[in-house]
Amino acid sequence: MFGQYEVFVQLLLLALIVLAGPAVILLLYLRGADM
């Protein structure tokens, strides 16, 4: 049970990184375009 929970947390962190990566790049691009 604890092992499944660890796997779920790792998948959640991986999903956050995959989603946050392009989001941060997009924010930096938009901020750079405004300037």
UniProtKB/Swiss-Prot annotation:
Membrane topology: Single-pass membrane protein
Name of the featured protein: Photosystem II reaction center protein Psb30
Family, as annotated: Belongs to the Psb30/Ycf12 family.
Principal cellular location given in the protein's record: membrane
Cytoplasm is among the record's keywords: no
Membrane-crossing segments per the record: 7-27
Signal peptide: none
Pfam families given in the database record: PSII_Ycf12 (PF05969)
Localization in the cell: Cellular thylakoid membrane
Functional summary from the UniProt entry: A core subunit of photosystem II (PSII), probably helps stabilize the reaction center.
